[in-house]
């Protein structure tokens, strides 16, 4: 989904059951400051996830004819994290549950190594490509650089990606 393949391409891919999301997410979404989230509007002037902010609000027809989210994930790690996470947090706060997925654009953006941005998916049984993709769609994954691991992460006994995996508090409080 890059750079301007838009909702029409998402419709075409989702009708086939694809897992889809924009690449190079942060380009064009630069914001001043270093707080997350912040209320500084990005310029939307690059090749990144500029269309994501609109596409995430749509549902499209899936392979079985039912409506599914037009965007499954937002790619992370290969552009400045503040720019990527800022737009993701804002869409999460608006109620859209888009997942994140690691991305490496080796050697175009970074020549450091293949696998700079990785998606780790918690699977119950044998690894297959389809199960791995479904794990991202369900949110049973985290993104990392290979140096830290959170595969058993949970809050208040709620595992990531199980059910709606949202933790709701009636008022500010501690989570464990």
Regions found by a protein language model. Name each.
Residues 2-114:
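Domain-core and long-helix interface of multi-subunit machines
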Residues 10, 15-19, 25-30, 87-176:
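C-terminal functional module detector
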């Amino acid at each position: 989904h890059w750079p301007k393949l838009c909702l029409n391409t998402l419709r075409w891919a989702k009708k086939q059951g694809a897992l889809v999301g924009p690449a190079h997410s942060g380009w064009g979404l630069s914001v001043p400051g270093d707080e997350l989230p912040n209320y500084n509007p990005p310029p939307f002037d690059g090749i990144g996830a500029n269309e994501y902010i609109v596409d995430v609000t749509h549902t499209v027809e899936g392979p079985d004819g039912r409506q599914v989210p037009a965007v499954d994930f937002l790619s992370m790690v290969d552009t400045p994290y503040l720019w990527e996470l800022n737009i993701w947090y804002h869409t999460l706060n608006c109620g859209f549950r888009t997942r994140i997925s690691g991305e490496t654009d080796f050697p175009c953006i970074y020549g450091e190594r293949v696998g700079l941005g990785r998606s780790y998916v918690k699977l119950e049984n044998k690894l297959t490509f389809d199960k791995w993709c479904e794990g991202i769609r369900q949110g049973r994954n985290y993104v990392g650089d290979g140096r830290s691991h959170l595969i058993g992460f949970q809050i208040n006994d709620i595992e990531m990606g199980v059910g709606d995996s949202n933790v709701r508090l009636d008022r500010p409080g501690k989570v464990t």
